[in-house]
From Swiss-Prot:
Protein source organism: Aliivibrio fischeri (strain ATCC 700601 / ES114) (Vibrio fischeri)
Catalytic reaction(s) noted: 6-carboxyhexanoyl-[ACP] + L-alanine + H(+) = (8S)-8-amino-7-oxononanoate + holo-[ACP] + CO2
Cofactor(s) for this UniProt protein: pyridoxal 5'-phosphate
Domain of life where this protein originates: Bacteria
Protein name (record): 8-amino-7-oxononanoate synthase
InterPro entries cross-referenced by the UniProt entry: Aminotrans_II_pyridoxalP_BS (IPR001917), Aminotransferase_I/II_large (IPR004839), AON_synthase_class-II (IPR050087), AONS_Archaea/Proteobacteria (IPR004723), AONS_Proteobacteria (IPR022834), PyrdxlP-dep_Trfase (IPR015424), PyrdxlP-dep_Trfase_major (IPR015421), PyrdxlP-dep_Trfase_small (IPR015422)
Length: 383
């Protein structure tokens, strides 16, 4: 019987290798900066999610060091035992006030926050409607939940409308991302919010890639479209330059999650020093508009310099997909760019649909205009 696991593991690995879809981890130095180092060689880094450049900010590092001196290294327990401290409470109240919802509940990752909501909220007889391109954390939780999950075509409001009409008699939760991580496009949140309200459904928005980057003072996609969802997910590994996540909702829903969301109840709380640093990151996001202004300038430059490159998608975000098609071709381009000192990542199935393998370029406020030109010139020449 023990051999069955070995055979299963070996077979899965071999299939992925034969399909050219095997992925590997690379040990990097300074991976949170505009330049990273791998095996002693420097590369311009166009693969991270540190959009505002906070991850390497000395100001933010000093805030975390201050938190360490005040609160020590770890929280020591789960939130409902003794792991919930003043920095956690402060961060939650600051997030709720900033984003205009009653309360916030902290989680250790966006993946766990998404799964916690779906696993704790949905019951048998409920309907879950998800955008087809939602994150793996949402899709996995939906498939494993007792609810009936249906997927609507990407950003297709008419398809969602038809699904809502069919599920009008059941409690229904509609889930979409604010910014889609592989395409860099925005969800039509105003239309979706209107539909959910008309059909007495709840709306959940995962704004992992929008919060901090878009909207007034970085409030994210919901601010862009002037909506307030029933549940809002924000994560701290992108615009905030750190890690972790929060679920924002009304007070009663927050009380419910603090009792029944197992990812929250049974996980050690994030270090209080981290929560302290996140409060400072929030202040930087609110006050340092120059970071978003610079991103806009770099975005315009990137799209202008690749305007004639087939497959370069225009987006209103720092996520710039370059659609190649076949996975092997995407890998070849990524490797060729690395030879020129440009670190990009080839995104292949199953992360994206078959036939849509791509180079996923991400921009950061830490990049310079010269960095962008180096990348676009290489892409134009190699493509």
């Amino acid at each position: 019987m023990k051999q069955a696991f070995n055979q299963r593991i070996s077979s899965a690995l071999n299939q992925r290798k034969q399909a050219g879809l095997n992925r590997s981890r690379r040990v990097v130095s300074q991976g949170n900066q505009a330049t990273l180092v791998v095996d002693g060689k420097s590369y311009l880094n166009f693969s991270g999610n540190d959009y505002l450049g906070l991850a390497s900010s000395k100001e933010l590092m000093e805030a975390w060091q201050e938190g360490l001196s005040l609160y020590g290294s770890g929280s020591g327990a789960s939130p409902l035992v003794t792991g919930y401290s003043k920095p956690h409470a402060n961060l939650e109240s600051q997030l709720a006030e900033w984003l205009g919802l009653d309360c916030a509940i902290l989680f250790n990752s966006g993946f766990s926050a998404n799964q916690a909501v779906l696993f704790s909220l949905l019951e048998k007889g409920d309907t879950l409607l998800q955008d087809k391109l939602n994150h793996a954390s949402l899709m996995e939780a939906g498939m494993l939940s007792p609810a009936v999950m249906k997927r609507f075509k990407h950003n297709d409001v008419d398809h969602l409308k038809s699904l809502l009409k069919r599920s009008s008699d059941e409690p229904t939760l509609v889930v979409t991302e604010g910014v889609f991580s592989m395409d860099g496009d925005l969800s039509p949140l105003a239309d979706i919010a209107k539909l959910t309200k008309e059909n007495d459904a709840w709306l959940m928005v995962d704004d992992a890639h929008g919060c901090g980057v878009l909207g007034t003072n970085g409030k994210g996609c919901c601010d862009v479209y002037s909506i307030t969802p029933d549940i809002l997910i924000v994560t701290f590994g992108k615009g905030f330059g750190l890690s972790g996540a929060a679920v924002l909702c009304n007070q009663e829903c927050g009380d419910y999650l603090s009792q029944f969301a197992r990812h929250h109840v049974y996980s050690t709380a994030m270090p209080p020093a981290q929560a302290h640093a996140l409060s400072h990151a929030l202040l930087m996001i609110q006050q340092q508009e120059w970071r978003r202004d610079k991103l806009k300038e770099l975005n315009q430059q990137f799209e202008s310099e690749l305007m004639n490159f087939l497959g370069a998608e225009k987006t209103p975000t720092p996520i710039k997909p370059i659609i190649i098609g076949e996975a092997t071709d995407a890998m070849i381009l990524a490797d060729s760019l690395k030879e020129r000192g440009l670190w990009t990542t080839a995104i292949r199935p199953p992360t994206v649909p078959v036939g849509s393998a791509r180079i996923r370029v991400t921009l950061s406020a830490n990049h310079s205009s010269a960095d962008i030109s180096a990348l676009t010139q290489a892409i134009n020449e190699l493509g």
